[in-house]
Regions:
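Short, positively charged and aromatic/hydrophobic N-terminal segments
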Residues: 11-12
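Membrane-integral, polyisoprenol-dependent glycosyltransferases
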Residues: 17-204
Length: 204
């Protein structure tokens, strides 16, 4: 037929790139999961009593600090020195109980805060290391079983994890700002967090 080109015409199939797939409603659902998990971490802190012997021992030492006013020499039962752990965990528990009262959730609150801050720090590292999906590392950490469970138990683990994450995040940020004047401050913050992770909370 005159005026009709018999040659086949190319056609294009519209496809979604991997990045656009992550922008679907499913992605937004997963992003809501992080604050939901953090809320869950705080909400369940007072649903059970203290576990013996570890949680009871940490709280006993913290209460002795409040009773005696001596925050430098941990004691148990007014007489037995308890120096097997550095004092930061005791200080955190004692401060929380002093502010909010003698409740199980108050004793565990510092660990829930440390977990929440660790999730935010992992997200900050994700912003630098995975800029196309900065929320993904935070989601992965928030859904790990052990960090989440540790946020509900009074031990040194969660505080130690927080300071370890803090110095990693500080050095990642310092690396990203290496050509700017603010890099030195992040390096100093990283070394301070490294010192705190090694000296203050102690190891399990």
């Amino acid at each position: 037929m005159p005026g009709v080109d018999p040659r086949p015409r190319p056609y294009h199939v519209a496809t979604m790139t991997p990045d656009r797939q992550f922008r679907s409603p499913v992605r937004h659902f997963w992003r809501w999961l992080i604050p939901a998990l953090l809320l869950w971490a705080f909400a369940l802190q007072g649903t059970r009593g203290l576990w013996s012997p570890d949680e009871g021992r940490y709280v006993d030492v913290a209460l002795e600090m409040l009773k005696s006013g001596d925050w430098l020499r941990p004691h148990v039962n007014d007489e037995f020195a308890h120096v097997t752990k550095p004092p930061l965990t005791y200080w955190a528990v004692a401060s929380s109980v002093e502010l909010f009262g003698r409740h199980e959730w108050a004793a565990r609150l510092p660990h829930a805060l440390a977990f929440a801050l660790s999730v935010l720090l992992v997200g900050a590292m994700g912003r630098r290391l995975v800029p196309e999906r900065p929320w993904l590392p935070a989601l992965v950490y928030a859904t790990f079983v052990l960090p989440y469970v540790a946020a509900h138990v009074i031990t040194t683990d969660t505080l130690l994890a927080f300071f370890t994450t803090a110095y990693a995040a500080a050095f990642v940020e310092a690396r990203a700002r290496r050509d700017s004047r603010g890099a030195g401050g992040y390096v100093a913050a990283g070394w301070a967090a490294a010192f705190a992770s090694a000296i203050l909370p102690g190891t399990p």
